[in-house]
Regions:
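Residue patterns forming the tRNA-binding/recognition surfaces of aminoacyl-tRNA synthetases
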Residues: 1, 7-20, 32, 74-81, ...
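Conserved phosphate/anionic-ligand binding catalytic regions in large, soluble enzymes, centered on
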Residues: 7-26, 188-190, 249-250, 254-255, ...
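Protease-associated
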Residues: 18-23, 29-115, 124
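Conserved oxyanion/phosphate-binding beta-strand-loop segments in alpha/beta enzyme cores
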Residues: 61-65, 69-106, 193-194, 198-216, ...
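Secondary-structure transition/capping motifs at alpha-helix termini
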Residues: 90, 131-140, 167-177, 248, ...
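Active-site-adjacent bridging/hinge elements
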Residues: 94-107, 139-141, 211-218, 325-342, ...
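Alpha-helical recognition segments enriched in aromatics with Gly/Pro capping
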Residues: 133-144, 249-251, 274-427
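Acidic, turn-prone loop/beta-hairpin segments
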Residues: 460-490, 521-611
């Protein structure tokens, strides 16, 4: 291969340069060999020549002269002189070739020189290139974030090492320029401390081996919205990587692998019984399965006779989350029938970021163990934002304490806000005004209607258990309300079956508004009438039926208010009734009481009234 005598490579993280083992160009872009005004010959991307070399131009002399142009592939495998001797020494010990040009399409033409440095120990793209070209693995940063003794910068923390590396390169005449770039960089989500990319040995689950099964199983799931299942999560599975399941921590589920201190033989222990058998000690079956206790259990290697110890890693907590469906029942050791009856789950719900979290861990483990999806229906939730649409953060001071919100507005009001505000998968701007508005429109109206009934039922000593709702004797208003009631129950039932949450909430709200603002207002004189004539009894029974039935339909959404209504209207009068509204069946639709023609006519009348009221205020 032809050596490169002078190339201009760019790098953002200077502390990685001592670990450099290759350069990388984009195979699809054009590169040039140029003679620059400073007397040096450079290789770099054609699109970036003016950006990088333009400042070398003089009044009577251009910044550079193009000697050759060629595709990026022409540079592949060309060798260059290592920046640091320590990297060459490390590569030689591994008997691997390095310090040549590689190709990958991740290299961009937005900044730098179009030639990037490669250090496989520091970054996913670099690691991928390293695997593709079987590059040496050089890692001159320790776990404390300090450069190691092999480098000229031993003991210096990585962030402080950047200027030292630049000084060293400049002193050796190998630094062309050190411009500042603004770029995205990972920070700790809790304290905003900059992180460092760092490769370390891990245990993996080879998910790539079951990629097709993962995609097939995901296609059986009803995702709401479908765009998440087919798009975000589907794309994640299309590009699935092997899952690094080990963590170097003290806490967590210990990785159940024992390794021989002599020959390296490894065994995966499948349970307490097997552990006791291998240890030759019945007490091992009772050991606390966490560190440090589990680490004390050792046994003899069958290959060389030396001692086998548990490896020090623990398991990623997301692996625990994916094991939830069977681990909660101690399956497969017991409760086999219970598990099989309840798996897969009919429905789960979590936030959109769980496409890489719980949704993934459940799907991965279910596919690996049972080759089927672990859930049938998924509602994906959008994130809760502040009233300005910003992500809530304690550090920014815009986070809402959920306990304060519950204290101020009540659980039902907050639940109702999320149901009625927007589709579940869209972000929600949470603020008090929106909660109280929903509380007023629906919950306040329902409660006022209930209070109206209770007030006059107590005055008249009306007991609904002593009367029967006789449909043939009902007025048009009564029949209309019952028709609206069971049309609403039917709509709510169908919407919930299809996971249409806002539609369900709006159907309930619409009915409650009609019941309060039209039925009760038009029928007040009937409740005020003297005695207990048939018409008055019909009004009471109609309103009672509507209140109890709509409360049962709304109970999953506003459990506390509906429970309060049920306790007073039902349990207080009927000792044989279920002790809670949440132990009742969902209301059954009485199709024979649904009169769509009557509903249409009443809707037209309501529209006329609304228009008439509007004209009054003109």
């Amino acid at each position: 291969s032809t050596p490169i005598k002078s190339s201009a490579a760019s790098d953002v993280y200077k502390r990685q340069l001592p670990s450099n083992v290759a350069l990388c160009v984009n195979p699809n872009d054009t590169y040039c060999k140029v003679k620059a005004a400073d007397g040096y010959t450079y290789y770099m991307a054609q699109d970036l020549l003016d950006t990088v070399l333009g400042k070398l131009a003089k009044d009577d002399e251009p910044a550079y002269e193009v000697l050759e142009s060629f595709p990026g592939t022409a540079l592949e495998h060309k060798e260059y002189e290592p920046l640091f001797a320590c990297a060459k020494e490390c590569a030689d010990k591994q008997n691997k070739k390095g310090f040549f040009v590689t190709c990958d399409t991740y290299v961009t033409m937005t900044d730098g020189t179009g030639i990037v440095h490669i250090a496989p120990a520091f970054g996913e793209d670099d690691a991928n290139v390293g695997r593709n070209y079987d590059l040496p693995f050089v890692q001159f940063v320790n776990e404390k974030g300090e450069l190691t003794e092999e480098t000229p910068f031993a003991g210096i923390f990585v962030k402080k090492a950047d200027p030292e590396v630049l000084k060293d390169l400049d002193a050796r005449g190998q630094l062309f320029d050190a411009p500042k770039f603004e770029h995205e960089y990972p920070h700790c989500w809790r304290c905003d401390t900059p992180l460092i990319y760092y490769a370390r040995e891990s245990w993996y689950i080879r998910e790539t081996a079951v990629k097709d099964d993962l995609i097939k199983n995901n296609n059986t799931v009803n995702w709401i919205p479908e765009s998440i299942g087919k798009g975000r999560f589907g794309n994640w599975l299309e590009n699935i990587q092997d899952w690094a399941i080990s963590r170097n921590r003290y806490w967590g589920t210990p990785l159940n692998i024992w390794e021989c201190e002599g020959c390296g033989h490894q065994e995966c222990i499948g349970g307490r019984k097997e552990l006791a058998e291998r240890a030759g000690d019945p007490k091992a079956a009772e050991v606390e399965l966490h560190r440090p206790y589990i680490d004390e259990v050792t046994f003899t290697c069958p290959d060389c006779g030396k001692v086998m110890h548990r490896v020090p890693e623990v398991i990623d907590c997301w692996f625990d989350s994916g094991a939830m469906p069977f681990a909660q029942y101690h399956y497969p050791f017991e409760n086999k029938d219970v598990f099989e009856k309840q798996f897969p789950a009919q429905f789960i719900s979590e936030a959109v970021d769980q496409t890489r979290g719980w949704f993934h861990s459940l799907m991965a483990e279910s596919t690996l163990l049972f080759n089927k999806a672990p859930y049938e229906n998924v509602i994906v939730l959008g994130h809760v934002q502040d009233e300005n649409g910003q992500k809530m953060s304690k550090s920014k001071g815009n986070a809402v304490d959920p306990f304060d919100a519950l204290e101020n507005y009540g659980a039902d009001a907050i639940r109702w806000y999320f149901y009625v505000n927007s589709a579940p998968w869209l972000p929600n701007r949470f603020h008090g005004k929106a909660v109280t508005e929903g509380q007023r429109k629906f919950m306040g109206t329902l409660w006022n209607t209930y209070a109206f009934y209770v007030l006059y039922a107590e005055i008249d000593q009306f007991n609904p258990t002593e009367h029967t709702l006789e449909y043939d004797k009902l007025s048009i208003m009564d029949r209309w309300l019952l028709s609206r009631l069971y049309s609403t129950v039917k709509e709510v039932d169908e919407d919930l079956d299809n996971y249409k949450i806002p539609e369900t909430a709006k159907a309930l709200q619409s009915f409650v508004e009609d019941m309060s603002n039209w039925y009760v207002r038009r029928c007040r004189d009937r409740f005020w009438a003297k005695g207990m004539e048939q018409d008055k009894m019909n009004a009471y029974m109609t309103l009672y039926t509507a209140l109890v039935t709509i409360s049962k339909a709304a109970a999953p959404m506003i459990p506390f208010m509906t429970e309060s209504i049920y306790q007073n209207l039902v349990c207080n009068l009927d000792s044989k009734a279920p002790e809670s509204i949440h132990l009742c069946d969902f209301p059954k639709v009485k199709e024979e009481w649904i009169d769509k023609e009557l509903e249409t006519q009443m809707k037209q009348l309501l529209d006329i009234v609304v228009l008439g009221r509007a004209l009054i205020h003109i």
